[in-house]
Amino acid sequence: MQENAMEAANWALTIFFYGLSWFIAVGSIMILWPVWEYLKKKAHEQKLKGEEIIVAQAMTEQKLTIDFLREEAAVKELERLKAESLEIKERNAVEIDGIDYQGLTTIELKAKAKELGITGISRRSKNQLIEDIKQALIEQAVETENVVLNDDAHAHAVASV
């Protein structure tokens, strides 16, 4: 009978320890599983935040590049418009006083140049005289425009007082 009691106690302890180990294993899984899921979620959120920061930095760099390119394009467009305006002024300089300078003789061109105050006209060719006359007419037009603008500014200043 003692043998049976020892064998029964042995089986009871074996079953108890197997049960205890299963209880610990299942309990650990039940406790650690939510902790594991929480840690995975936090790691994923941190990864997303890092990606958001990288994307935001890249977008900032792209925005700066786009702004720089737009400014460069605006500067080039402004330069092109200035050059075009100057070219139009040069082409239309002949029309300022309504005379076709290509049809005039060299003597008539020299007289017009002298009238405009151009010096050193005796050694110049017909085309050089035409260019000098155009340049003088452009300068006169610019000076006249500046005088008108200054008079307008002066009139506005007097009117505001």
Swiss-Prot record:
GO terms for biological process: DNA-templated transcription termination. It comes from the Viruses. InterPro entries: Rho-like_N (IPR011112). Pfam families: Rho_N (PF07498). This is Uncharacterized 18.2 kDa protein. It comes from Acholeplasma phage L2.
